[in-house]
């Protein structure tokens, strides 16, 4: 049986004798909550799981308050897959399909001609956006390439998503040479070689301490306190109402007439419904 102690947590760790840092994350209930309101095919579920883990690992590298959005855009059956996470490890995800998919489809078959877009948005300061070609077989490989190109740091990403003991789970590890230039490529390669031996069931079933001991029992590893991860959408009646105000009065009247006087707005991420009748819309306009 899995030890649930480290479910939905992120750990950072350092190697005391080598200038290399690491992160480990596992999503259990967070992943389940994301999938609960959608009937995504298994291949899309797993892709979102990989992207959620990657987003969690990416946000943990931020040195400021803000959020990161990781999205896949393409002209294939998968039109969009999007994950957003912030420095508090609150995360949400959604996918949009424009054709049927099968679970044996590769990333290239799902996306067609597509790109991976990473947007970093500090609470204060300028946004940064990077666009990466989806020219590798997995999202993980594309993101690993992004790290190397954007930060010019040796980086290893190991991410898995699927089921363990009958429940959805996604987990992963990030290994990165320290940005201060004190680390050696040889040290990084040594640790990366050890990390590459990790098994899926170990990522899904062991605690962080057990896993790191299994991989690095001859190393001195300092593990920092964990950070909890949770599904958080952020939608609200107010935000939905603000979106309605962007529509012309004529269009609103048409939609109201077509839907028996009530507009039902459903959040794509969490599935919550927000209802607006004519009186509610008029009140929104007054408050504006």
UniProtKB/Swiss-Prot annotation:
What this chain does, per the record?
A: Redox regulated molecular chaperone. Protects both thermally unfolding and oxidatively damaged proteins from irreversible aggregation. Plays an important role in the bacterial defense system toward oxidative stress.
The Gene Ontology biological process terms listed for this entry are:
protein refolding
Which cell locations does it reside in? Cytoplasm
Per the record, its GO cellular-component terms are: cytoplasm
Taxonomic lineage is: Bacteria, Pseudomonadati, Pseudomonadota, Gammaproteobacteria, Pasteurellales
Gene symbol? hslO
The question of whether RNA-binding is a record keyword is answered with: no
> Which domain of life does this protein belong to?
Bacteria
Which residues span the membrane? none
Q: What protein name does the entry list?
A: 33 kDa chaperonin
Q: Does the keyword Cytoplasm apply?
A: yes
Q: How is it modified after translation?
A: Under oxidizing conditions two disulfide bonds are formed involving the reactive cysteines. Under reducing conditions zinc is bound to the reactive cysteines and the protein is inactive.
- Main subcellular location: cytoplasm
Q: Which InterPro entries match?
A: Heat_shock_Hsp33, Heat_shock_Hsp33_C, Heat_shock_Hsp33_N, Hsp33_helix_hairpin_bin_dom_sf
Q: Which HAMAP family match?
A: HslO
Note the SS bond partners: 233-235, 267-270
> What organism does the UniProt record list as the source?
Pasteurella multocida (strain Pm70)
Query: Any idea which GO molecular function terms this record carries?
Result: protein folding chaperone; unfolded protein binding
UniProt KW keywords: Chaperone, Cytoplasm, Disulfide bond, Redox-active center, Zinc
Family membership, please give it: Belongs to the HSP33 family.
């Amino acid at each position: 049986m899995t030890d649930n102690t480290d479910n939905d947590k992120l750990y950072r760790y350092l190697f005391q004798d080598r200038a290399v840092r690491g992160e480990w994350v596992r999503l259990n209930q967070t992943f389940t909550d994301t999938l609960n309101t959608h009937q995504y095919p298994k291949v899309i579920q797993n892709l979102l799981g990989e992207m959620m883990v990657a987003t969690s690992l990416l946000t943990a590298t931020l040195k400021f308050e803000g959020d990161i959005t990781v999205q896949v855009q393409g002209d294939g059956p998968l039109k969009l897959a999007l994950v957003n996470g912030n420095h508090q490890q609150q995360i949400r995800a959604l996918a949009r399909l424009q054709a049927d998919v099968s679970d044996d489809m590769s990333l290239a078959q799902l996306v067609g001609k597509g790109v991976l877009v990473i947007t970093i948005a500090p609470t204060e300061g300028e946004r940064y956006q990077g666009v990466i070609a989806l020219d590798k077989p997995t999202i993980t490989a594309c993101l690993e390439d992004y790290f190397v190109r954007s930060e010019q740091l040796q980086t290893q990403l190991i991410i898995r998503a699927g089921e363990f003991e009958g429940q959805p789970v996604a987990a992963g590890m990030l290994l990165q040479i320290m940005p201060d230039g004190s680390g050696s490529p040889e040290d990084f390669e040594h640790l990366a070689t050890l990390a590459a031996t990790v098994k899926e069931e170990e990522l899904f079933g062991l605690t962080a301490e057990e896993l790191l001991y299994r991989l690095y029992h001859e190393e001195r590893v300092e593990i920092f306190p964990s950070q909890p991860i949770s599904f958080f959408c952020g939608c609200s009646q107010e935000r939905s109402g603000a979106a309605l105000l962007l529509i012309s009065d004529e269009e609103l009247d048409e939609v109201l007439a077509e839907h028996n006087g009530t507009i039902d707005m459903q959040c794509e991420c969490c599935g919550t419904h927000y209802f607006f009748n004519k009186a509610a819309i008029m009140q929104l306009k007054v408050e504006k």
